Every structure is written in C-alpha cells, then in structure tokens.
C-alpha cells in the first residue's frame, strides 16, 4: 500500500434502510457490513493517533455498543464511536466511551454536540477514556459538567496546560 493510499479516507454510502439523522447503534449482532464500517473508522482512529492496536474488530464477541455517524445530506457515514461496559485501563465502575473518530471535515460542526444528549440518555454518566486529544478534552469539559468524572477531566486539562496530556509531554506526541 502506498503512503497516499494508507492515509486515504473512504466514506461509504449509507444503505437506504439505515438513513437517519441520528447515530446508528451497532452491536455484535448487527449485520457484518455495519460492523465492518465501524472497524474501518477504528482503523482511521488508529492511524491518526498512531496507536499500536486497533480499538475495534468486526468479529469480536465481547459486549459493546458502537455507533455510526451519518451525514444525512451526503448519505455517507462520517465516523464512529464505541462504548464498552468497562474501561480498558482505568478502574471505574461505569460504561466507557472507549474511542471516537469523525472525519476531519465534520469535526467542530456540531455532530458530537447533537449526539451527546442521546449518548448520555442511553449510557448514563459514562467515562470518556483517555488519552484525549485537546479538542476532545475541551468538548468533555464543556459538556460533562454534571459528570462524576468531571474532576478527573479537569485534572487532565491542568496537565495539558502544563505541557502534558495523560503523562506524556506535548513534545513527545
């Protein structure tokens, strides 16, 4: 795979029966085509943030609820996120938003802001698992003031102002 192909983002058309203005829930029982689309966004997430592991596999059997974000005007999927019953690395007794990826064009355009109340209603006071980009940290601080995890996010924000995010200096990113 050439370098330009490695970084190419392909947005797939939304099949007619799944067209909506709301994020589409995807579970381990959903059609393979939907699970594979979530997996594709997990691969983009891995590449963008230079992670060693992929956060989602379409074949996995552990419980999760992922969501595909639609662009209803263009009828394409523009991103995904995944909730799990627990955190991978943190000792919290809560559902956890383990990862989220949106196409760069659609970031900061209200997609997540619009979906957030739905996520809170569906998953309660969930934990947003670090590491968080500075943009995501800012979003979480703005939209989770009533969360029992708010103090933790404030602590992360303090570290980021000192040049650290999750214990890693910005220079190391």
Regions inferred by a protein language model and the residue ranges of each:
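Non-catalytic substrate-recognition and accessory regions of acyl/acetyltransferase enzymes
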Residues: 1-106, 117-127, 132-137, 142-146, ...
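A short glycine-leucine-enriched loop at secondary-structure breakpoints
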Residues: 109-114
């Amino acid at each position: 795979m050439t370098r330009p192909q490695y970084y190419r983002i392909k947005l797939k058309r939304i099949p007619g029966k799944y067209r909506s203005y709301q994020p589409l829930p995807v579970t381990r029982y959903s059609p393979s085509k939907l699970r594979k689309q979530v997996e594709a966004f997990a691969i983009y997430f891995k590449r963008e943030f230079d992670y060693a592991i992929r956060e989602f596999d379409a074949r996995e059997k552990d419980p999760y609820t992922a969501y595909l974000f639609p662009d209803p005007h263009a009828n394409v999927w523009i991103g995904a996120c995944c909730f799990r019953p627990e955190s991978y690395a943190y000792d919290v007794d809560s559902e956890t938003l383990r990862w989220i990826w949106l196409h760069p064009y659609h970031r900061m355009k209200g997609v997540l802001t619009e979906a957030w109340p739905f996520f809170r209603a569906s998953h309660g006071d969930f934990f947003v698992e670090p590491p968080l980009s500075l943009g995501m940290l800012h979003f979480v601080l703005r939209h989770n003031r009533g969360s029992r995890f708010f103090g933790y996010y404030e602590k992360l924000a303090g570290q980021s102002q000192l040049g650290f995010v999750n214990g890693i200096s910005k220079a190391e990113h």
